[in-house]
């Protein structure tokens, strides 16, 4: 199961595009709200969540995805349950993926230290001790995937498919 964590103010395309590509690849993917059945993004688009945060089960998790959108990122940061979940997931070897502004969360938690990563350009300095690849659209290093910005949502989503199901699966989704 892939869990996409949504907090109020998330960037809609950064949640929807990767979710769509993951589902096209046959990966069970759930949109997860911090609370309540719906979550509104930074541009006023409201999504229906499949689950609430309390229903995330790391025993069946392949990956946790953190979309950007500064409001959503700050809401994720402010929720101690999210920090605990991410730390536990990292300890269990669950893939962690973050796009645009969201990699700063992984940086704040020290999870990118010594790893290659990217993020929204004005956030590069907030990636902890990561080796920043400023021109990269999507980067995987260990069990971490980071993405550049909203415009790289497709590249990021395809990278998620690639790390979970292989290059052939990513090519197949790209060719749909």
Language-model features: locations:
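Short gly/ser/thr-rich secondary-structure transition/capping motifs
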Residues: 43-52
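Histidine-anchored nucleotide/phosphate-binding helix
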Residues: 19
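Membrane-interfacial amphipathic helices and adjacent loop/beta segments
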Residues: 31-32, 37-43
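Glycine-rich, flexible N-terminal cofactor/catalytic loop recognition
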Residues: 14
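Active-site-adjacent pocket-lining segments in enzyme domains
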Residues: 1-10, 23-34, 51-52, 56-176
